[in-house]
């Protein structure tokens, strides 16, 4: 068996490594960026060193994937070339590739991807998988006695960088006719937070990496929106958190001023919140001279758009309704099993209290005689890659792949039929 490279090619991050391993060899941003100190765009570095080595203040960003689909093959080729040569140190001609691709991709994008793999890099064979099917495979292997494993059926909710999918999976194949999508993901959340902060305090519209870091460290899902809005309006310090901006001298990246205080509100009981609600704090205007930003209701209004897309002017259903619509599109025999096998994956599921909020909103929409069980992956960012690594270690993997010779003889469209039935 040839060397197998597993590549989870996300819109935000690339996870890559050798098949059969537990964790990927490297995780890098799927982009090129140009810091203010540089005259040219720089290849991405692994996440463990990215923020420490380079000042990303006002860095320009170029991405090959937009809204989940490949739009710049030349840029993707450049990023992959750096990945294979400098980080993975592999020879594509003697390697097989397991590559993830967003569901419902259009034929022109599929052809471009196949050309990159076989014609530009010369991989010996290729297997394309939907990320959600790999999540299902990994979770079924982790829970051999669960209903998910016994029925080989699940509903994967993938809140990724570009958008959110509710995908029914049966026997490791996605049921494409039942897939539902919300056009919201990590990128949209970051952009919304940039707009809120820029309107209320200082202009951070060019600070993509900075605001993204603040979002990941400070945002959470509200379990009682009206209560939290009242607390924020009253200037209550339990909601407020401060994010310190880099000054370029003592520190080149932002950080949370008091991490423990930022988590304090999450542990409040309902009785305590009623007491503190009556304590009105002094509301102050933003100090434009301070090198920091204060976040109050922004912390929960940003993730709230996942449940209320109408807040952004979008005519789309929220997350709970999206899940119900996806399950209702499946055969009635599958529906009770799908409600018991809901899996949350993707970086945006890391918002605190998201699972609890989803359970509360989903239960009233589900028939009383159906049980609802939601599980969150142990690592929602690496879950897809780990499923791919598991599939790559299967003895049947090579027979599932399309070889370069088959691609050259039959073309992209004919070869694709082997991946998705």
From Swiss-Prot:
Gene Ontology molecular function: structural constituent of cytoskeleton
Disruption phenotype: Early flowering, leaf serration, production of extra petals and weak apical dominance.
UniProt effect for mutating residue 248 to S: In strain: cv. Goe-2
The keyword Cytoplasm is assigned to this record: yes
Stated name of the protein: Actin-related protein 6
Top-level taxon of origin: Eukaryota
Family the entry assigns: Belongs to the actin family. ARP6 subfamily.
Protein's GO biological process: actin filament-based process; cell division; chromatin remodeling; defense response; negative regulation of flower development; regulation of DNA-templated transcription; response to osmotic stress; response to temperature stimulus
Annotated effect of mutating residue 290 to E: In strain: cv. Kil-0
Organism encoding this protein: Arabidopsis thaliana
